[in-house]
């Protein structure tokens, strides 16, 4: 069942908070308080400050969201 009224955005993790919470600065300049989705938590994906993430926001409260995907870093020196 797909959820309605969701807004997707990309941003940069600026701060790691207790209990799996993070502050994310989106590409349009908004600061959002986010938590990790269950799928990321279950697969033990590590999210650190400086990572690019994809965030899902509710249309009713644009200050809180859920991290649904960690984007790969293009600036690796491999």
Curated annotation (Swiss-Prot):
Belongs to the IF-1 family. InterPro entries: NA-bd_OB-fold (IPR012340), RNA-binding_domain_S1_IF1 (IPR006196), TIF_IF1 (IPR004368). Keywords: Chloroplast, Initiation factor, Plastid, Protein biosynthesis, RNA-binding, rRNA-binding. Transmembrane segments: none annotated. The keyword Plastid applies. This is Translation initiation factor IF-1, chloroplastic. One of the essential components for the initiation of protein synthesis. Stabilizes the binding of IF-2 and IF-3 on the 30S subunit to which N-formylmethionyl-tRNA(fMet) subsequently binds. Helps modulate mRNA selection, yielding the 30S pre-initiation complex (PIC). Upon addition of the 50S ribosomal subunit IF-1, IF-2 and IF-3 are released leaving the mature 70S translation initiation complex. One of its GO terms (cellular component) is chloroplast. Component of the 30S ribosomal translation pre-initiation complex which assembles on the 30S ribosome in the order IF-2 and IF-3, IF-1 and N-formylmethionyl-tRNA(fMet); mRNA recruitment can occur at any time during PIC assembly. Gene3D superfamilies: Nucleic acid-binding proteins. Residues 1-72 form the S1-like domain. It is found in: Plastid, Chloroplast. GO terms for molecular function: ribosome binding; rRNA binding; translation initiation factor activity.
